Amino acid sequence: MIAGKSVLAFVMAGGEGSRLHPLTAERSKPSVPFNGRHRIVDFVLSNLVNSEIYSIYLLVQYKSQSLIEHIRRSWVLTPLIPHHFITVVPPQMQCGPEWFQGTADSVYQNLHLIDLIKPDLVVVFGADHVYRMDIRQMVQYHVDTHADATVAAIPIPLEQVSSFGIIRTDSAGRIRDFQEKPQSAEPMPNRPGVALASMGNYVFSTDVLVDALTRAHSKGGHDFGKNLLPAMCESHRLMAYDFSSNRVPGIRDFEDASYWRDVGTIDAYYAAHFDTLGECPAFCMSNPRWPIYAAPDQTEAAQVHDGHIRSASLGAGVLVRRATIERSLIRREVVVEEGAEVADSIVMDRTVIGAGAKIRRAIIDQNNFIPPGMRIGYDREADRARFHVTDSGIVVVAKGQLKP
């Protein structure tokens, strides 16, 4: 119970993540690994559990097997307490022979789950962002303002509005207009160059949500941002929750207390990793008072047999033999052989970097074998001929692309 209300959560975890290709070639976006031993979905699930929201349905669709296995291994809540569960829900075709047609449709097709739990409030959260949030504070705001629906909001630069739902509010914080990914938008009052954007996190009063979903479905509307929320602006009381007011315990003075990143592109995903590195990171992965949970790991600790390591994170089971690693994140069971150099890079699980190989500004997905002496990130044209390279020059080696 939060603010005297029972709460049910739906997590939108069915996204294809085409802008993260090739990392999403064999997995959904929420299942993409992040940092030392997490996956992107772990952030929203940790925020829900830390906020004492334990009734959680995870709605999946696109290439979901990797995500399903991760939830099975990592996210088992006690079955002894009623309404303590994290349940994966693939498309059930409850409304006919079709998959989920959008975010709102995925909840509409599972209205029977709401009827089963009978919560006072329903929270609908995305699964593809890196952040910490005490969701109880947003729920309290929803109750205190007598809202029908509440949208978590954050300021963004005007040049990014085409990637977000854009909100216009009155002086009391009531949403008067909602546009999904417009080409342009008016700046916030007294804040030139900045617009107010939806974070894709919502709180609904249950009866309002059920009615709005039913109405949207009857008109062919399948998406919260495109259809449901714009239609509700005039007919219902929609409030914007200022994410910058959210306070999570354990945040250090040097951290960005309002850190939130959409990691839906390769460049954004790459940059977010480096926000976790250094002596004073913008986002510290370690916070005992608000942990980001991950799968239990039985692997042995990392071993370094000489070499040079600076401002790096090494996962369990990593083996470094007289190699150089700078400003990089190395995930579990990676082997870095003698004379190899890794700089400004992310190397994922069970990859071997051969002797004398050099890697910089790259993302190496799981299960790769980098041959001895190979160079990645030093010749853009040569890299483009073999790998995916972003416009900013980040090289991505797909999962298992390079074999021994």
UniProtKB/Swiss-Prot annotation:
Molecular-function GO terms, alphabetical: ATP binding; glucose-1-phosphate adenylyltransferase activity
Biological processes annotated in GO: glycogen biosynthetic process
Keyword ATP-binding: yes
Entries under InterPro entries matching the protein: ADP-Glc_PPase, ADP_Glu_pyroP_CS, GlgC_bac, GlmU/GlgC-like_hexapep, NTP_transferase_dom, Nucleotide-diphossugar_trans, Trimer_LpxA-like_sf
Pathway this chain belongs to: Glycan biosynthesis; glycogen biosynthesis
Enzyme class: transferase
Keywords (A to Z) from UniProt: ATP-binding, Carbohydrate metabolism, Glycogen biosynthesis, Glycogen metabolism, Nucleotide-binding, Nucleotidyltransferase, Transferase
Taxonomic superkingdom: Bacteria
Positions bound to alpha-D-glucose 1-phosphate: G165, E180, K181, S198
Annotated CDD domains: ADP_Glucose_PP, LbH_G1P_AT_C
Enzyme Commission (EC) number: 2.7.7.27
Reactions performed catalytically: alpha-D-glucose 1-phosphate + ATP + H(+) = ADP-alpha-D-glucose + diphosphate
Assembly mode: Homotetramer.
Protein's job: Involved in the biosynthesis of ADP-glucose, a building block required for the elongation reactions to produce glycogen. Catalyzes the reaction between ATP and alpha-D-glucose 1-phosphate (G1P) to produce pyrophosphate and ADP-Glc.
Family of the protein in this entry: Belongs to the bacterial/plant glucose-1-phosphate adenylyltransferase family.
Protein name, as recorded: Glucose-1-phosphate adenylyltransferase
Gene giving rise to this polypeptide: glgC
